[in-house]
Structure formats: C-alpha cells, structure tokens
Regions:
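Catalytic Tyr-X3-Lys loop
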Residues: 46, 64-83, 98, 102, ...
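Alpha-helical segment proximal to the catalytic Tyr-Lys
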Residues: 91, 135-139, 197
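C-terminal helical subdomain
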Residues: 146, 167-195, 199, 206-208
Length: 228
C-alpha cells in the first residue's frame, strides 16, 4: 500500500479527499469488501474503475503449449475481477440514480498473437462484458465503457519491455512518441465525468494509432521505392 498511500496523501494535501485500501483482485470477497468499505467511508459510490490485469509470459504461450493453470488464473484476474467489480458496484449506483463504470481492457483483445493466448482472450471478454453491462443498466442511468491501452510507458514497461520492442512499437505508431500513464488517466477521467454522459458501451483505444496501419505497408513502400 506504500505507493497508494503516497498518492492518497498527495490528493489530500491538494484539497481532495482520498484513502488507500487493500485489494486482492483474485478474491471476490476482497473486491466486495473494498466497495463496501468505500461506501461506508464516503456514503455512496458514483464511479468505479476496474483497472487490473496481467499475465505470466513464461506460462501464457500458444494454445497447445500454454499452462492450463495460467489460463484459469488469467481469466480469474483479468475478467472475473471486472465482473465482480461491476456486480458489487451496480446496486450502490442504482441507489444513487446512476453512475459510471470504466473497465480496462487491452489492444490485445482485438489482435491475434503468437503468444499471450490467455491475456488476449480474457481481455476480449472485458470488451464484451462492458457492452452487456451498458445494455442491461443504461435505463437506470448507469454507463459502462472500456479503455484499451496500447504500449504505455509505465514503470513496468520501462523496466521490463525490451528496448527493441519499444523501438518497434514506436516505429509503427502513427504518432511520433510512446503513450504515458496520464494518457490513460485523462481518458478514464473523461469517461467518469458528465462530459461523456451520452457515451456508453464503447471501448476507447488509446494506442497512438499503432494498429491503424496496414501490416503490408512497409513492404509496399519498399517495393515502390525499388521501382523508382
């Protein structure tokens, strides 16, 4: 909780109100306790950001060779936690007359890969779950949207993503720079606010235009240059 406490302290010093609370996203009781504790502390719940995810690269391989235990653990972490976050938050939002739910998915939800079968499949489930929640509770003024980050320069990415992969992502981004954590934070803030009150069931891709490129484009450009 050290980093969370530091963030909460900074918010409080700047005139806001914040508390840091423990959560084990693999345990539904922990998720429920977090939401109940939040309501007990602040009186109500208007917004929830289900922001959790991850995988074990050594075990999350192709469909034949991946670890089956990692498949179940990955789904428990990446989508079950989101489902329970929605499930336990919605009744409180119903009492308030509405609310906003933001789920973090990933661009891996939309693209096949040679590895990370569990991660991509479970994050794809988050996209679908987001639409279902939006459809089921929209008439009660509860919105549900998702954010799909590309490669974002979080501390984990800075320290663990190989430099050649960072350079590769940058090469194929439509924009000339990497994404930063604030790019995700501002998107979530928009979806949490009334400025997005007519948006629901959507997944906002925050990925610098990396995936809009035609994968054959580099070869086509090289071919065209060779013909000159």
């Amino acid at each position: 909780l050290e980093q969370a406490n530091a963030v909460a302290e900074k918010i409080n010093k700047n005139g806001g109100t914040a508390s840091a609370m423990f959560l084990n996203a693999l345990e539904k009781e922990s998720i429920k306790n977090l939401i109940d504790q939040t309501v007990q502390t602040y009186g109500k719940l208007d917004i929830i950001h289900n922001n959790v995810g991850g995988t074990n690269p050594q075990a999350d391989l192709d469909i034949v060779n991946m670890d089956e235990k990692e498949w179940h653990r990955g789904f428990q972490l990446n989508i079950d936690s989101v489902m329970y976050g929605c499930r336990y938050a919605i009744p409180h939002m119903q009492k308030n007359g509405g609310g906003s739910i933001i789920n973090t998915t990933s661009m891996a939800a939309f693209n096949g890969d040679f590895m990370r079968t569990t991660y991509g499949s479970s994050k794809a489930g988050v996209v679908s779950l987001t639409r279902y929640v939006a459809a089921q509770y929209g008439k009660q003024n509860i919105r549900c949207n998702a954010v799909a980050p590309g490669l974002i320069m979080t501390p984990a990415a800075i320290h663990h993503v190989p430099d050649f992969m960072k350079e590769l992502f940058l090469k194929f981004n439509a924009l000339p720079y990497h994404g930063e954590p604030n790019d995700i934070a501002y998107t979530v803030l928009f979806l949490a606010s009334d400025e997005s009150k007519f948006i629901t069931g959507q997944t906002i891709e925050v990925e610098g235009g990396h995936y809009i490129n035609n994968p054959t484009a580099p070869d086509m450009v090289a071919f065209a240059q060779a013909q000159q």
